[in-house]
């Protein structure tokens, strides 16, 4: 779908479908009044009959109104006079998109300037959410279906903006388009079956991306290099699988050579059986999504590349497959990490932190401004926060605050959890420097505490996306593309874009 921005009068546009808002109690804003006047009171007449109550997201399609060049006019309810929240705004836009998809029109014009959104400016903030909602709603994953989705008639959507705000709306569309590209790439990787999407496949994806972008350097560390670097924890996770582990390094130089990079670290467990600590069979198919941390880093990089942000960014994807076999890691094994610290592996299903801890140590060599790791790390995070918000922890209040703010602005929220010293005690082991689990209490926090022991050399934050990375079961099952909006917003803010 192509999104364009224009500054013209709604009543004069020629289009298959013109979309205008109508408030409750037959309230017409400036746009609706102008269209009503041009159509000789057709809008008012419909409202007087009570055909549309004007509640947020309600729609009514009108055909061939006199005095207009638009073939159809779609009225959408905008509610009472107060501003809509982010959720209501997104639902309204999705409602409009749903109607437009069912029509045979190749284009549509949205004249929604009269709708206010809480805590969003009238141009960039409001239209960024609108554009992301439209573009993300276009996503279809039918690669393995013998019968593909029908091509959609709607090819172009024009957003009408006032002249003063047109440039900001265009900037919003540009950013939203890049984020949507990144989210779609993330969702594609997450939705792929694990027999195809394994560590070596992700390495090939990285190489292909490097070939397509001159400013991107790609290095793939194989299992021998991982072992030679002393990454005993990382190596242990993949040793039970026929698919060897890979540490994928993508280095984007968009800033000055002297600028310290931001580092994103993604957990890339392409399939997680739990290893010897085997997971229950029910729902195990969804463990292909255990690489969504790495996928979201990939997607964020895609957005950064599209926008050519003036920053330096290093992406580290810690990829392995966690399988049981005669050569797999056992509960009770002790491994030495790249940092020199030893870990007693009490549960092989707590494997994500093992690939991440060595990767966090590896990140030190880049002398980063900040390091953010993203992982579908703990089921405990789903229990604590559900699927609406990602868990967030860190060792630097400014960094955590910047990420929380980015989440609010991108409508991709996170919630901070503590890393108090008392939780560290739960990781004590009688045989090694630490165990890889901290008991049944505060599982998300103790996982963060574990990682914090390997991130003392820099400002660091950890995002647990176990509840937000994919939707379980039902017709909407699949990867969500989160937290690409949050991460991209954070980098946009750092770049001043």
UniProtKB/Swiss-Prot annotation:
Active site residues of this protein: 279, 353
Main localization of the protein?
cytoplasm
Question: What are the GO BP annotations of this UniProt entry?
Answer: proteolysis
A GO MF annotation of the entry reads:
metalloaminopeptidase activity
Q: Which positions bind Mn(2+) 2?
A: 267, 272, 290, 351
Q: Name one GO cellular component term.
A: cytoplasm
Q: What is its EC number?
A: 3.4.11.1, 3.4.11.10
Question: What keyword terms does UniProt attach to this protein?
Answer: Aminopeptidase, Cytoplasm, Hydrolase, Manganese, Metal-binding, Protease
PANTHER family, alphabetized: CYTOSOL AMINOPEPTIDASE, LEUCINE AMINOPEPTIDASE-RELATED
Q: What is this protein called?
A: Probable cytosol aminopeptidase
Q: Which organism is it from?
A: Pseudomonas putida (strain GB-1)
């Amino acid at each position: 779908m192509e999104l364009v921005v224009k500054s013209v009068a709604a009543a004069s546009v020629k289009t298959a479908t013109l979309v205008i808002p109508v408030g409750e109690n037959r309230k017409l804003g400036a746009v609706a009044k102008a269209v009503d006047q041009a159509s000789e009171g057709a809008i008012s007449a419909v409202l007087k009959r009570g055909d549309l109550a004007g509640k947020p997201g309600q729609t009514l399609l009108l055909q061939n109104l006199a005095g207009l060049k638009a073939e159809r006019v779609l009225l959408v309810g905008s509610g009472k006079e107060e501003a809509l929240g982010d959720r209501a705004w997104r639902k309204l836009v999705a409602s409009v998109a749903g109607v437009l998809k069912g029509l045979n029109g190749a284009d549509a014009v949205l004249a929604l300037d009269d709708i206010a959104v809480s805590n969003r400016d009238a141009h960039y903030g409001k239209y960024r959410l609108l554009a992301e909602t439209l573009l993300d709603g276009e996503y279809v994953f039918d690669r393995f279906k013998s019968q593909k989705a029908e091509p959609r008639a709607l090819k172009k959507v024009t957003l009408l903006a006032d002249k003063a705000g047109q440039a900001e709306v265009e900037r919003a569309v540009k950013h939203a388009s890049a984020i949507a590209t990144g989210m779609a790439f993330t969702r594609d990787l997450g939705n792929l079956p694990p027999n195809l999407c394994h560590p070596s496949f992700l390495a090939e994806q990285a190489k292909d991306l490097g070939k397509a972008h001159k400013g991107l350097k790609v290095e793939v560390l194989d299992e021998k290099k991982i072992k030679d670097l002393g990454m005993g924890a990382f190596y242990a996770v993949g040793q039970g699988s026929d698919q060897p582990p890979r540490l994928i390094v993508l280095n984007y130089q968009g800033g000055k050579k002297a600028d310290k990079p931001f580092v994103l670290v993604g957990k890339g467990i392409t399939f997680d059986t739990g290893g010897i600590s085997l997971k229950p069979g029910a729902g195990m198919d969804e463990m292909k999504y255990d690489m969504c941390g790495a996928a979201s880093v990939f997607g964020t990089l895609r957005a950064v590349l599209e926008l050519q942000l003036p920053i330096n960014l290093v992406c580290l994807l810690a990829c392995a497959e966690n399988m049981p076999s005669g050569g797999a890691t056992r509960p009770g094994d002790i491994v030495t990490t790249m940092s020199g610290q030893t870990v007693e592996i009490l549960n092989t299903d707590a494997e994500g932190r093992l690939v991440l801890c060595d990767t966090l140590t590896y990140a030190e060599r880049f002398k980063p401004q900040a390091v953010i790791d993203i992982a579908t790390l703990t089921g405990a995070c789903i229990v604590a926060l559900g699927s609406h918000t990602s868990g967030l922890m860190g060792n630097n209040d400014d960094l955590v605050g910047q990420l929380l703010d980015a989440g609010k602005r991108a409508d991709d929220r996170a919630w901070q959890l503590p890393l108090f010293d008392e939780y560290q005690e739960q990781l004590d082991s009688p045989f090694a420097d630490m165990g890889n689990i901290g008991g049944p209490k505060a599982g998300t926090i103790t996982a963060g505490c574990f990682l914090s022991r390997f991130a003392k050399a820099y400002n660091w934050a950890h995002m647990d996306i176990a509840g937000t990375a994919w939707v379980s079961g039902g017709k909407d099952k699949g990867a969500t593309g989160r937290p690409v909006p949050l991460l991209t917003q954070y980098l946009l803010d750092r770049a001043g874009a």
